[in-house]
């Protein structure tokens, strides 16, 4: 009986000892990756890109001894290879985030993307901000200036995102600083958009039209809509009196100047269908479509809610419908 009791006590003591070891546990072996640490390179005012931080490695003790509750594990953060390019994001102002690429060898940074919050900037405000701040950003963040060709990439449009983007393949010395005076934007006209920086040019006129999606080319360029408008006006001038011809020239001039406020090119080729917006008067925006055969049609008429109530807009259209069709179609 005494021997049996001693055996039972030994077995129960062994079970308690193993239970304590299971409850205490042991850290994973050295070198095992247990988690990804996302803020290893965090700097004030900067939003870290997830792809820029490697996984963290657990460096706890071995599994032979029990770990105490007061022990603190050590973490070793792997650094990127020397000379390897790394992306990082800086929030320069509320609603403005810029993605940079650190160049190899510590040679500065390259500007990759500028992101604007759609809740704080429309496309005209974003263009104006970049025109006023591009030199400051280049100096502040040590952005290298390249003389290589800058090629635009296709614009991104995602209805699920509430942000707008400037995308730039490379940084240039000739970043545009001149911005046209845009027409006022109403909430229903704000859509997803992209603006791309062209290569530096020598003439001031080309610099004023660096943002092609935001302003059309000057009348002297090879824009098919401008050529079609001039060709349509020539036979009309030939069959009208001098006074009527003068009115037609004024109308063409008004169209050319007003269309610089905004241009919208459809998904089809420019040689097939072209659309542009004309500001007939403050608060009235007329969208005209030109087909491949040169015929024009009135696409839509939009009124600013700040200047026109619904009844006033209907009255304005009834009074000016014939004039609009004769002037722009």
Swiss-Prot record:
Residue ranges crossing the lipid bilayer per the database entry: none
- Identify the InterPro entries for this entry: Brevis_radix_dom (IPR013591), BRX-like (IPR044532)
| Limits of the BRX domain | 86-142, 274-329
Region ranges (Disordered):
12-37, 151-263
Which UniProt keywords are listed?
A: Nucleus, Repeat
Localization recorded for this chain is: Nucleus
Family per UniProt?
A: Belongs to the BRX family.
Protein name, UniProt field: Protein Brevis radix-like 4
Species of provenance? Oryza sativa subsp. japonica (Rice)
């Amino acid at each position: 009986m005494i021997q049996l009791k001693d055996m039972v006590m030994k077995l129960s003591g062994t079970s308690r000892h193993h239970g304590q070891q299971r409850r205490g546990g042991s850290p994973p072996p050295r070198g095992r990756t247990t988690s990804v640490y996302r803020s290893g390179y965090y700097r004030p005012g900067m939003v870290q890109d997830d792809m820029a931080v490697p996984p963290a490695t657990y460096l706890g003790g071995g599994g032979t001894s029990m770990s105490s509750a007061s022990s603190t594990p050590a973490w070793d953060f792997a650094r990127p290879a020397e000379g390897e390019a790394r992306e990082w994001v800086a929030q320069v102002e509320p609603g403005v985030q810029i993605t940079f690429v650190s160049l190899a060898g510590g040679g500065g940074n390259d500007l990759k993307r500028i992101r604007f919050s759609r809740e704080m900037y429309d496309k005209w405000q974003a263009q104006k901000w970049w025109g006023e701040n591009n030199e400051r950003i280049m100096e502040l963040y040590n952005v290298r200036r390249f003389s290589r060709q800058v090629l635009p990439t296709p614009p991104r449009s995602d209805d699920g995102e509430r942000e707008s983007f400037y995308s730039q393949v490379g940084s240039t010395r000739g970043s545009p600083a001149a911005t046209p005076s845009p027409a006022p934007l109403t909430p229903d006209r704000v859509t997803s958009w992209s603006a791309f920086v062209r290569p530096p040019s020598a003439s001031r006129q080309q610099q004023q039209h660096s943002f092609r999606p935001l302003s059309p080319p000057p009348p002297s360029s090879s824009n098919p809509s401008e050529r079609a408008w001039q060709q349509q006006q020539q036979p009309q001038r030939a069959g009208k009196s001098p006074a009527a011809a003068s009115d037609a020239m004024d109308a063409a001039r008004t169209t050319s100047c007003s269309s610089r406020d905004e241009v919208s090119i459809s998904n089809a080729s420019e040689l097939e269908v072209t659309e542009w917006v004309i500001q007939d008067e403050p608060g009235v925006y007329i969208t005209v479509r030109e087909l491949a055969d040169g015929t024009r049609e009135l696409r839509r008429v939009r009124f600013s809610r700040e200047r026109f109530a619904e009844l006033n807009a209907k009255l304005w259209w009834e009074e000016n419908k014939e004039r609009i069709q004769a002037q722009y179609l």
